[in-house]
Amino acid sequence: MLGLLLFIIGGIADSIFTVNPVVVTATRTPKALKDVPVVTRVIGLDDIRRTDATNIQDLLTTELPGLEFGYAMSREPALNMGGFGGNAILFLVDGERLAGETMDNVDYSRLNLDNVGRVEIVKGAASALYGANAVGGVVNLISREDTAPWTLNVNSRYSSAGDGWRNGVRFSFKSGRWRSQTAFQQSRVSTIRLADAFDTQSDLQTVWGGSVVSVKERLIYNPIENLKLIARGSFFKRHSNRTTYTDHYDDYSTGLRGVYDFGIGRNLEISYSFDRYDKSRYVLGQLTNSHDYSNRQHVVHSLFNLPVGKWQLTFGADYMNDFLSTYQFTDNQGKRQYSADAYAQFDINLLPWLNIVGSLRHDYFSASKSNATTARLAAMLKWSGFSVRSSYAGGFRAPTLKELYMDFDMVGMMMIYGNPDLKAERSNNYNLAFEHYGNIRGCFDGSYSITLMGYCNKYDKRITTTDVSVDSEHEMGLLYCNEDGVTVSGVEFNGKIRTQLGLSAAVSYNYLCASGNSMQSQFSQPRRHSMTCHIDYDKQIFKNYSISASVSCRYMSKSRDAAAPDKAYSIWKATLNQRLVKAYSLTFVIDNLFNYKPKVFYLNTPTTIGTNFSVGLSVDIDSLSF
């Protein structure tokens, strides 16, 4: 219907002039977005700026339907994406995994956006390329590539919600064979009181305040024309201020990657990465050792691309050494496992309008002695203004060291026991998507795209907990186990329009239905209907002055979770950005425009107490005239 309306307004041209970014996550090889047979969502740098997002949690919540962040029992953020919990979604930074977890979720505070150029999201299983945890999807944060000789940006942002401050500095230079990117970000926020401490209905009374410091360095060196070496390092520190104690979260990460280009599509990539994520608890400034946690991962990765006639072949292998020491193990002892995998992929254009990609991968995990072979087959048909994508993908998640070996006394209420006999979770994902795109001519010169996707994900042997009675080996508590799975199916619609007048708009709607035992483990009953939309206006008013305005909305239908029956809601956000003399950017934001206030705060309720305001200033020092 939208396409017909646009046709009536101006007429459809045969080609599109919208930006067509190159993506890497769906196939592990650079490929134009319009040519990728696997449905991929890209959130570009302009979108990141428009949303005024601080971290990946803010960005995904604003841009994607079918996704919701709530809170775990630890009062740390927990993700539900398309009916899957955080441990079924694989988060990557430039294609590399992250160590550590907070109640089955990565620490989303680590994923700030200070040096991110785009975010690529692949929904559905992707284990045939990425192995464990890619059961429900992959979210890959790609670093930006600065091409100027040097850049220097300083920025600061204040939010009335919790009197929050975010300050950052980003510097890059390019000289001869060297390129460098350095990013520093510091943020702090006060505790926000959501409900009265005696509110017996609310599960969540406060959002705890704290501070975050993050430093990242990325150094690129080209010793010869065809060889690129990429060294990186990062430091992260977060404090979460609770009533009687403070939790500390620290991460140290480093890596080295080499890419040699043989020419004509042939290249070899070899990398090593190390990531250490630690947690500890302090009372009155003193380390208690009661909640010590340390996860250390060493990963070696190799990838080889080889064109053979019409075929593009990809071969890869990985090795990971995973060590975990935690207060949830007996006597804080450490456990270790290694995993190894090998995979292959073919990519062929059988006809100018037909592309087929197939992948096969085998993984082995030593602790659970789990073997998993997963496959993916995707096809794309395209002709003028239309494309059809269809895919099958297998997914799996091996039991974690925590799920295998936990022996944890939960403050005297119950025991939680690991299970060395756990089997790997498995999934089968099916996708079918139709896309139509074109140009508009006439009074609304521009372009548009419409995508309609149906999906079904059958999840089996999922890991959850079951009651265990008192016997010679156990006290009363919970035991990790495998149980019957869940089927998640749905429909997603995306529509975008962009005009040369500076006006643009986008709407995304998701209908989701989950059947099976979806109330336990990482699943909660997902909301059936969700939608995001935004209307934007971008205009150069004068030579040294331009504006960008945006109004966005996020709608979520009522929760079907009997334990957390949150009502339907919508939250609106207005953003105004002014750019002066190419160097200064001043941003004003009104969030929760219509002052929505939940009456009861469940773990999946939006943590807002009404309208809040923020203002930010960003200065590109390199663009100033000295």
List the predicted regions and their residue ranges:
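C-terminal beta-signal and adjacent terminal beta-strands/loops
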Residues: V22, K558, D566, L576-F626
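Extracytoplasmic beta-strand/coil segments of soluble accessory domains associated
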Residues: Q57-E96
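Membrane-embedded beta-barrel scaffold of Gram-negative outer-membrane proteins
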Residues: E269-V283, K382, R389, K423-C481, ...
